[in-house]
């Protein structure tokens, strides 16, 4: 099976991104490849963020695009359902489903798959996970040359996806900041020590476990 690392270009999912992406996939399926309009102007984000959003829509299972020909995006059945029933991703249950899609997507989000399905350390550092990931990669001949920088960036992106920045940098980011990823609401990762940069996998609160 193919493996993919650092396809996010270091950009984690920001609040509102997935909703914005779905809106334009619905109205303009070629939004990411159109030559008549600049995707940056249409989406209101920078070039690298456009690439990241294109990747994330597919990684969380909302959209798909062909490997050949005109690579326009279209909704998956799951994506169509989310767009019809919770396009602004306001329900906790929708977040859980998006997380499940991401964490089970070994081909498109390899580091996420290993982190949530096979990495069993409850308390860990970056080096712990990257070393574990390197061991798994060595078992896959086609992915044996993955750069350590890519693995480090994937770890950082995982942390930024699930851990709000007001916890990691409380003096620099306000709790209501919209730069955070909505997946942080799930409470799946917590920080043990900002100084030592140690983290732990967390058990979601009762409120988030009753999402509907």
Task: Locate each region found by the language model.
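Donor-sugar nucleotide-binding helix/loop cap in glycosyltransferases
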Residues: 1-212
């Amino acid at each position: 099976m193919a493996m993919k690392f650092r396809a996010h270009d270091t950009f984690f999912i920001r609040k509102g991104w997935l909703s914005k992406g779905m809106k334009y996939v619905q109205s303009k399926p070629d939004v990411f490849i159109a030559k008549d309009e600049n995707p940056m102007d249409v989406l209101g984000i920078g070039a690298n963020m456009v690439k990241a959003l294109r990747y994330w829509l597919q990684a969380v299972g909302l959209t798909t695009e062909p490997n050949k020909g005109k690579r326009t995006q279209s909704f998956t059945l799951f994506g169509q359902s989310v767009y019809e029933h919770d396009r602004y991703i306001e329900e906790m249950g929708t977040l859980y489903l998006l997380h499940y899609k991401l964490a089970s997507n070994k081909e498109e989000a390899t580091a996420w798959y290993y982190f949530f399905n096979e990495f069993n350390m409850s308390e860990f550092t970056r080096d712990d996970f990257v070393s574990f990931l390197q061991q798994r990669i060595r078992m896959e001949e086609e992915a044996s040359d993955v750069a350590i920088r890519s693995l480090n960036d994937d770890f950082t992106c995982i942390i930024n996806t699930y851990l709000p920045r007001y916890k990691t940098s409380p003096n620099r980011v306000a709790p209501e900041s919209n730069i955070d990823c909505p997946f942080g609401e799930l409470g799946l990762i917590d920080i043990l020590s900002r100084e030592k940069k140690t983290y732990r996998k967390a058990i979601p609160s009762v409120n988030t476990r009753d999402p509907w």
